[in-house]
Regions:
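Glycine-rich beta-alpha junction loops
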Residues: 65-67, 87, 135, 150, ...
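Conserved small-domain helix->loop->beta segment predominantly found in fold-type I
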Residues: 148-207, 211-216, 234-239
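PLP-dependent enzyme catalytic core of the Aspartate aminotransferase-like
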Residues: 1-8, 19-22, 204, 220-271
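Short, well-ordered beta-strand elements within core beta-sheets of diverse protein domains
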Residues: 129-138, 186-193, 249-253
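Conserved PLP-enzyme active-site core in the AAT-like
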Residues: 1-159, 164, 175
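Short, flexible turn/loop "capping" segments at secondary-structure junctions
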Residues: 91, 123-125, 179-183, 240-244
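Structural beta-strand/beta-sheet cores of well-ordered domains, especially the beta-sheet scaffolds
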Residues: 57, 96-97, 161, 186-188, ...
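Short, acidic Gly/Pro/Ser/Thr-rich loop/turn segments
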Residues: 107-108, 136, 195-198, 229, ...
Length: 271
């Protein structure tokens, strides 16, 4: 428990488990992601919002991976939507920031706290976000188109065990994604045959994509959760959560599809 907040983790795709947690734990806030990181699972936002409302909980969703272009959680009934400005909204990997949008009755309470504690973004960073937002749609459309091509190509590669992308029919949430999202996004996850060592070899052989843990910029970024976002987890915990050995997360940038495909091909050929 930190700051008096007791957190309980529940698989939000299990709606019965969510409702039980809302009832039994007297939950005040339901917090989820539109598209989860790094497994790219899709949350059924209308159902989750309805459950939160039924039990008097505030519903909050991090919709960074979807962006406002692909999904508007407010229309699905959520109270608050969080976006990382650092990622796709800014799109140039040169600032840190976040934003919260939502229903007036909830935002008014946040605004009161903001007046007391102050904001954290300086004017220059705010101007950089405004710059990035001007090209958000064209950047997102281009990178999403390339991501879909890459996902389909990777799925047929002999060195790849599994590809996770909402736009593939093999994705567990393929049908749900069409209900929640207007497209499949620019994030692609996949599993390299041979485990983490082979995955690391592939990353070290990449020339076009850069190894980094951020996402949503004009440049393609690639990383392995076992060594970055989930490095503090045990291997057993990662595998239990679905992050298999050899798991790779790829943020698609604005590079040409053929350049990225050829880069992956030569890197995978080295294995």
């Amino acid at each position: 428990i930190r700051f008096g907040i007791d957190v309980h983790y529940v698989d939000v795709r299990d709606l019965d488990a969510v409702e039980n947690a809302l009832k039994e734990k007297e939950t005040k806030v339901l917090y989820c992601e539109t598209v989860t990181n790094p497994l790219l699972e899709i949350s059924d936002l209308p159902e989750l919002a309805a459950l939160a409302n039924k039990h008097g909980a505030v519903s909050i969703v991090d919709s960074t991976f979807a962006t406002p272009i692909s999904c508007n959680p407010i229309e699905h009934g959520f109270d608050l939507v969080i976006h990382s400005l650092t990622k796709m909204l800014n799109g140039h990997s040169d600032l840190l920031g976040g934003t919260v949008a939502g229903k007036t009755k909830v935002i008014d309470k946040i605004w009161e706290k903001l007046r007391n504690f102050g904001g954290s973004m300086d004017p220059h960073q705010a101007s950089l976000v405004e710059r990035g937002m001007k090209t958000l749609q064209i950047r997102y459309e281009r990178s999403t188109e390339t991501a879909a091509k890459l996902a389909n190509w990777l799925e047929s590669h002999s060195k790849i065990k599994k590809v996770i992308y909402p736009g593939l029919k093999s994705h567990d949430d393929y049908e749900l994604s069409k209900k929640i999202l207007s497209d499949s996004g620019n994030m692609v996850s996949f599993v390299v045959k041979g485990g983490d060592d082979e995955g690391r070899k592939m990353l070290n052989s990449m020339n076009v994509a850069s190894q980094a843990i951020s996402l949503g910029g004009v440049e393609s970024l690639i990383s392995m959760p076992y060594a970055t976002t989930h490095a503090s987890w045990t291997q057993e915990a990662r595998v239990a959560a679905g992050i298999d050995l050899g798991f790779v997360r790829f943020s698609t940038g604005l590079e040409d599809f053929d350049d990225l495909k050829n880069d992956f091909d030569q890197a995978l050929s080295s294995l």
